[in-house]
Amino acid sequence: MTRTARGVIAFIYLLPALALAQQLPRADRVPGGIALVELGVGADQPMPRVRYLDRQISVLNRDGKWLAMVGIPLDTEAGIQALLVNDKEIKFQVNDKEYATQHLTISNKRQVNPNEQDMERITAERVRINKALASWSNNDPLKRDFVPPVDGERTSSFGLRRFFNGEPRNPHSGMDIDGNEGDPIVSPGAGTIVETGDFFFNGNTVFVDHGQGLVTMYCHLSRIDVKPGQTVEAGDTLGLVGSTGRVTGPHLHWSVSLNQAMVNPGLFLPTEADTAD
């Protein structure tokens, strides 16, 4: 059973996925996870304005209630977090999670320690990436359940603490899915292409805005088959699996950004599809 907020500051119980309507990710209240928070307002009332860490949050009408879908950044510390809902606070708990480590060997040393010219390129690309991830449209981002973007084994999990050639680097901000060079990559849901290009680390990359701060990212493609401004539906081809950028072999790196926080893509897939060694 769910409970509504009482008073100006209230704790809200986060809903188990099975209690919710379809077209929602699974809740996992950890760094890199997702909080699904009932806002205590029926859908017969105006949609609440919700912010978290000074960012606009997705608000969905599910089962006649307004629900916030909140991406929790990977660097969030365990403890109490707060949503600003109109002029009130609603608090929720984030639990601790220890992610495993992964050691990779990269033959191209510049992909581990870029030179000055590389860093200039990386800095410029970061501006483009951040702009794409900050995209916002008012569409319902989950009109239907997501489908896997490529048919393959999940080979590297989200959140891994990574070491390249023995040197620590940023955590793994997506899911790696094995594939053969040239395998098709499809959009998991409806959306608009907001950015494409060849990036230093990510190689050939596509960004899809699904609505309300939900943006997906597809890296290391051998070929890009879409252009910015193009609309896509679930199952439409975005490009082909490749090995461009910083890779050890052909695969798809798939990232999901929610309110500009990288979250576990597996939470948007059926549990049987969310497996990795």
Predicted regions and their residues:
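Zn2+-dependent peptidoglycan hydrolase active-site motif and core
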Residues: 188-222, 250
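N-terminal signal peptide c-region/cleavage motif recognized by signal peptidases
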Residues: 14-18
